[in-house]
Amino acid sequence: MTQVSTPVRTRFAPSPTGFIHLGNIRSALYPWAFARATGGTFVLRIEDTDVERSSQAAVDVIVEGMKWLGLDHDEGPFFQMQRMARYKEVLAQLVARGQVYPCYMSMTELDALRERQMANKEKPRYDGTWRPEPGKVLPAVPEGVQPVLRFRTPQGGSVIWDDKVKGRIEISNDELDDLVIARPDGTPTYNFCVVVDDIDMAITHVIRGDDHVNNTPRQIHIFRALGQEPPVYAHLPTVLNEQGEKMSKRHGAKPVTQYREEGFLADAVVNYLARLGWSHGDDEIFSRAQLIEWFNLDHLGKSAGQYDEAKLRWVNSQHMKLCDNGVLAGLVAEQFARRELLVPVDERLARMCALFKDRCSTTVELADWLSMYFVPIQASEQDLAAHVTDAVRPALQTLRDKLAALASWDKASISLCIKETIATHALKMPLLAVPVRVLVTGRAQTPSVDAVLELFQQEIVLKRLQSV
């Protein structure tokens, strides 16, 4: 079990530059679950410094996706663009301490340096031309050039941290060049802003994708330059798509909210995503409450998780079986609304859900089944020819007459009518039940025919049986 000595504070810090997919949202789920499991605080931070690509629409999609999945944040959303004055204040502190310095090297010079290094089979990196050192003569400052500010990365030694997923990581400082932390216009860069945010928001645990591992040693140096110890890091392996590629919009990933439209339950998606990189023994199906009870960082997986839609559909089907029928009724009504069909969310719809949900893996499939109750049906010619034969028509007429005479439309009365008809015509149950299903529901296979008929309005059943 993960031991924590101070109140846990985690964060999800997406960039609003496009829709959010399952691979992204897992980086929200785990810090949310860890905060909830430890009684901590979950912070939402929007890293919107890429002004050209960021949009309010993308922010709205992030918030909507998190809201649907129930990943509620305790603080935020905080926007980096609204914190620029704070970043510049902290940057001035580093300047005053001599921990950053101006660099006037042009992009042309940097490109030429990089080409020389690559030609010599060296790692491309800034060579410290403008880094002040005792006794070093710096180049003449070019006229009319605004410098970037670079951070003085410690020389010699290494950066070490105990990653909660990857274990002990050590990176030599000689591998790191002097990071640009402010652009020529004075705007702070990503790695600097992140550290200031994490300090100001008192983040104790950073749980994020392993594409950030290379940023971590740089951020640790900035933390320590500001007199702070870094948080605990947990770098999550990549989520792969079904083709084994990194999940991304380019490779066909869907927006999180599309899963809602396709009939997946939020709790099922949370369950599936949690298992895509974390485990609690052999438990495959669990509730949100169980996830919170069980979640810790010690059982995060070290290998990439691969998305499998068939498995997600199976998980969803299990959650549908467990789902409250009244809740399902509301979700099915939303599916009907997308088809421009207004269906009341009432006890009758809940009973329909109870009867048919075990046959379905999504609420879209459940709405497909239940549409027989609300719109005209059309049985296939094949089913009509196979089951509604001349031999059974007299029995169908007898059953219709008995059903028409019922004063009480309930399962027991309908069942009695069916049994009496079978006895009168010396039939076996399937020889009557299947043609009734075909005529009334449009399908040859359904749950128990008396239970199915009970949920119809009596006059609709009589009208559909009249077609014989």
Curated annotation (Swiss-Prot):
<dbReference type="GO" id="GO:0000049">
    <property type="term" value="F:tRNA binding"/>
</dbReference>
<dbReference type="InterPro" id="IPR001412">
    <property type="entry name" value="aa-tRNA-synth_I_CS"/>
</dbReference>
<feature type="short sequence motif" description="'KMSKS' region">
    <location>
        <begin position="246"/>
        <end position="250"/>
    </location>
</feature>
<comment type="similarity">
    <text>Belongs to the class-I aminoacyl-tRNA synthetase family. Glutamate--tRNA ligase type 1 subfamily.</text>
</comment>
<dbReference type="GO" id="GO:0006424">
    <property type="term" value="P:glutamyl-tRNA aminoacylation"/>
</dbReference>
<comment type="subunit">
    <text>Monomer.</text>
</comment>
<keyword id="KW-0963">Cytoplasm</keyword>
<dbReference type="GO" id="GO:0008270">
    <property type="term" value="F:zinc ion binding"/>
</dbReference>
<dbReference type="Pfam" id="PF19269">
    <property type="entry name" value="Anticodon_2"/>
</dbReference>
<protein>
    <recommendedName>
        <fullName>Glutamate--tRNA ligase</fullName>
        <ecNumber>6.1.1.17</ecNumber>
    </recommendedName>
</protein>
<comment type="function">
    <text>Catalyzes the attachment of glutamate to tRNA(Glu) in a two-step reaction: glutamate is first activated by ATP to form Glu-AMP and then transferred to the acceptor end of tRNA(Glu).</text>
</comment>
<dbReference type="InterPro" id="IPR008925">
    <property type="entry name" value="aa_tRNA-synth_I_cd-bd_sf"/>
</dbReference>
<dbReference type="InterPro" id="IPR049940">
    <property type="entry name" value="GluQ/Sye"/>
</dbReference>
<keyword id="KW-0547">Nucleotide-binding</keyword>
<keyword id="KW-0067">ATP-binding</keyword>
<dbReference type="InterPro" id="IPR014729">
    <property type="entry name" value="Rossmann-like_a/b/a_fold"/>
</dbReference>
<dbReference type="InterPro" id="IPR020058">
    <property type="entry name" value="Glu/Gln-tRNA-synth_Ib_cat-dom"/>
</dbReference>
<dbReference type="GO" id="GO:0005524">
    <property type="term" value="F:ATP binding"/>
</dbReference>
<dbReference type="Pfam" id="PF00749">
    <property type="entry name" value="tRNA-synt_1c"/>
</dbReference>
<dbReference type="GO" id="GO:0005829">
    <property type="term" value="C:cytosol"/>
</dbReference>
<dbReference type="InterPro" id="IPR020751">
    <property type="entry name" value="aa-tRNA-synth_I_codon-bd_sub2"/>
</dbReference>
<dbReference type="GO" id="GO:0004818">
    <property type="term" value="F:glutamate-tRNA ligase activity"/>
</dbReference>
<dbReference type="InterPro" id="IPR004527">
    <property type="entry name" value="Glu-tRNA-ligase_bac/mito"/>
</dbReference>
<keyword id="KW-0648">Protein biosynthesis</keyword>
<keyword id="KW-0436">Ligase</keyword>
<keyword id="KW-0030">Aminoacyl-tRNA synthetase</keyword>
<feature type="binding site">
    <location>
        <position position="249"/>
    </location>
    <ligand>
        <name>ATP</name>
    </ligand>
</feature>
<dbReference type="InterPro" id="IPR000924">
    <property type="entry name" value="Glu/Gln-tRNA-synth"/>
</dbReference>
<dbReference type="InterPro" id="IPR033910">
    <property type="entry name" value="GluRS_core"/>
</dbReference>
<dbReference type="InterPro" id="IPR045462">
    <property type="entry name" value="aa-tRNA-synth_I_cd-bd"/>
</dbReference>
<feature type="short sequence motif" description="'HIGH' region">
    <location>
        <begin position="14"/>
        <end position="24"/>
    </location>
</feature>
